[in-house]
């Protein structure tokens, strides 16, 4: 494991990439409504990246042993899709929820964030899922302090989610970020004491991204080799921020229009 520690200047560069991500995610949120396709949202994001002189860190991405390269600039995961949904012809309907994961490269530095958006009016249980997942993110961010360890972040989010009767997704989680989209350390969403648990130190920049299911935590991958869905077909939500570890409070580099009321999370 090789963890990078960033200078203030480098963190500011990552923040600039995060600002582009944040601005475009706000546009995607506003454009999300019944009748819109996930492909149209992807095209909007691509156009806005080009207009800002930024590039996508999603499109063409190929992790080890995964074929084909990811075809979109956003991940568009609808309802029971957890992460890595491929944008295309799917038409959003009233009552859907869509997780939009999006990143950008600005001057060689990466930003990454995700939101889950209700499409029109959604069922109370779906609304509560979004609120719990968003609040879990802020619980996790509050634990992202120098002197704590990676699994303190995982534990804070998981305990919050499970206390609300939902499940934290297995296998997937957050990551370091900087010159590459995915760097060390891995930030598991579910606490596993067998996993590496490095100390959090000032200068680390990480992406924290709880993925929460209404049902059980299990998932499966579809035949497109990308889309991950809940094993039991239940709804899933996903929120993410890029966060710098400092000598004091965690510094959120993709603070999407104050997604929550504070680090404690929204009351649910």
Label the predicted regions.
Residues 1-268:
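Active-site neighborhoods and metal-handling regions in enzymes and metal-associated proteins
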């Amino acid at each position: 494991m090789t963890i990078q520690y960033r200078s203030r200047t480098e963190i500011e560069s990552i923040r600039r990439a995060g600002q582009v991500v944040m601005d475009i995610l706000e546009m995607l949120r506003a454009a999300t409504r019944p009748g819109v396709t996930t492909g149209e949202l992807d095209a909007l994001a691509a156009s806005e990246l080009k207009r800002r002189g930024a590039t996508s860190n999603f499109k063409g991405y190929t992790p080890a042993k995964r074929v084909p390269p990811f075809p979109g600039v956003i991940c568009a995961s609808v309802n029971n899709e957890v992460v890595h949904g491929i944008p295309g012809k799917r038409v959003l309907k009233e009552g859907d929820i869509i997780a939009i994961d999006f990143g950008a490269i600005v001057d060689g530095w990466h930003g990454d964030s995700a939101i889950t958006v209700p499409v029109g009016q959604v069922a109370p249980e779906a609304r509560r899922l979004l609120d719990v997942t968003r609040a879990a993110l802020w619980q996790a961010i509050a634990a992202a302090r120098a002197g704590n360890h990676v699994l303190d972040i995982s534990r804070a989010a998981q305990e919050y989610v499970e206390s609300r009767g939902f499940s934290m997704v297995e296998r997937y989680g957050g990551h370091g970020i900087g010159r590459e989209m995915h760097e060390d350390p891995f930030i598991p969403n579910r606490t596993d004491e067998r996993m590496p648990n490095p100390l959090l130190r000032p200068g680390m920049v990480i992406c924290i991204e709880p993925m929460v299911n209404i049902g059980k935590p299990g998932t499966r991958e579809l035949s497109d080799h990308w889309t991950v869905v809940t094993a039991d077909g239940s709804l899933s939500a996903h929120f993410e921020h890029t966060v710098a570890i400092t000598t004091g409070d965690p510094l959120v580099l993709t603070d999407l229009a104050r997604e929550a009321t504070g680090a404690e999370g929204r009351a649910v």
